[in-house]
Amino acid sequence: MANKHLSLSLFLVLLGLSASLASGQVLFQGFNWESWKHNGGWYNFLMGKVDDIAAAGITHVWLPPASQSVAEQGYMPGRLYDLDASKYGNKAQLKSLIGALHGKGVKAIADIVINHRTAEHKDGRGIYCIFEGGTPDARLDWGPHMICRDDRPYADGTGNPDTGADFGAAPDIDHLNLRVQKELVEWLNWLKADIGFDGWRFDFAKGYSADVAKIYIDRSEPSFAVAEIWTSLAYGGDGKPNLNQDQHRQELVNWVDKVGGKGPATTFDFTTKGILNVAVEGELWRLRGTDGKAPGMIGWWPAKAVTFVDNHDTGSTQHMWPFPSDRVMQGYAYILTHPGTPCIFYDHFFDWGLKEEIDRLVSVRTRHGIHNESKLQIIEADADLYLAEIDGKVIVKLGPRYDVGNLIPGGFKVAAHGNDYAVWEKI
């Protein structure tokens, strides 16, 4: 009986440890918009960065789309099983990179682009809508009846209506078609079993319904999944975000809820991204919502929110929605001390000379067990000062104001600091 009690106790300890590790995730985007141009291949190049990535405390690396694509970056895929035609490298190099990550205890996340697909051949109408899967057999060899019926001119009118937003540059795939579902699930499971991927980042996830995403997640069982649902915030007449962004973050929460809140699904917290972009420009009061909590998705459902400063679209050479470049470390001081799962961008870590500063912040997060559901207490949120305490162990300050000594309780010491930010940790 004693042995049984001991075994049960050990099981509960390990279960708790497993849950703690799962919630302490730090994601890293391992590429930018120009990575495909790298001499010798990006997969080979990134192999040389694995030690630094693992040493930083990063738990997951998001890799670029791996399949053959008519766009060099991988976001216009065609032959999904063909991983040898990628501009980032070939299948063997990809597997070696994933093996190296696994050897350091880091998981690999695939960029899954399935909303749309480019065709290999024209049909009798002269329209490119005959797809080739990239295998000798008929897997993923589809025709126009696998295209959403309302996606003209590609469709032949036999498919189901689109369940999400239209993507104009390529045919929108009919995800209500049972063969489409079956063969995409098989492909996802092949990426796991044969290539070694552990989870998914769903590109343009607003292009198909959450019910569809649930099918792919439930039937492929990734350990981690994050969706890109990028929609516009609500803006006022001054061109700045409204104080209340509840409708915007509700869309993100609704997606996760429909996919299955108890599963691995998360979404990028575009609400926090948009607010933080403006807040660091002398409007730090924006970081306290009308309910006194964080104003983004992390204020409502932090366990399912992936926070970020920039990515290959918002930053890099595309600059669609860039974070103020001279305040990037304020952004990292925020996301790396707050609840939610933070995502670090390759450019900032390796190309901007910010590696040591980001390393220190991740170390503070790891050392004090800050995780995606940590308790956030906002102490001050004024134009020039944001001050918050996390789990009673870490305090973060953003903004140029320096007279905050009276707001920092005893028993804390400075753990990291830089341009208009500082972090204290409990001694």
UniProtKB/Swiss-Prot annotation:
The protein's required cofactors: Ca(2+)
Broadest EC class assigned to this enzyme: hydrolase
Recorded GO MF terms: alpha-amylase activity; calcium ion binding
UniProt keyword terms in alphabetical order: Calcium, Carbohydrate metabolism, Germination, Glycosidase, Hydrolase, Metal-binding, Signal
Coiled-coil regions, chain positions: none
Site (Transition state stabilizer): 313
Active site: 203, 228
Name assigned to this protein: Alpha-amylase type B isozyme
Keyword match Hydrolase: yes
Family under the similarity heading: Belongs to the glycosyl hydrolase 13 family.
Domain of life: Eukaryota
Organism: Hordeum vulgare (Barley)
Induction remarks: Type B isozyme mRNA is undetectable in unstimulated cells and increases a hundred-fold after stimulation with gibberellic acid.
Misc note: There are at least 4 types of alpha-amylase in barley. Binds starch not only at the active site, but also via accessory binding sites on the protein surface that are important for efficient binding to starch granules and thereby increase enzyme activity.
Positions bound to Ca(2+) 2: 132, 135, 137, 141
